Amino acid sequence: MSFLLRPSSRTVIRFRPALHLASLGLLSTLCLTLPAHATAASDSQQALAQLEERASQASPREQCFLYAQIVHAMTEQAGQQIADGDTEQAAATLQQVNRYARLIHLNLAHNAKRLKDAEELIHNTTYRLAECLHLVSGPDKATVQDTLKQLDQVNDELLTQVFAH
């Protein structure tokens, strides 16, 4: 029975090239995914810039939803920056989130289009930012709390507008 437990020398030799190929495949996969992370960040920056451009040129009725999309994307970006430990960049991103939240507030008076979609997006964004609140401390926590307060206010205003129409 011990012959069943011991692999024969033929078996080991036969699988050795497969191990090398598997190792090579794993190594090449790792090497290819590292630049993909940098490319993904660059792509998301480009998409965000395009969204900002589209929002700046959109009609006042459409801007509310586009700004909500920008706030959502920037909050996700800030969450990733917080998770990566880049709190200074996250604080700058959250300042931009505050700016766009104020723009949403100002555009509500223009009979905004897709109010319910914008409200749902801001609600999800607020929830995500509340999760990020537990990852920061000190002065960074105050920045996140201020942004969260601003988004809560915008969400309440959006809800009021949704139920008014």
Indicate where each model-derived feature is located.
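Bacterial N-terminal signal peptides
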Residues: 18-33
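N-terminal targeting/docking segments
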Residues: 11-15, 34, 108
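Long, charged/polar, soluble alpha-helical segments
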Residues: 38-165
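N-terminal secretory signal peptides that target proteins for export/translocation
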Residues: 1-16
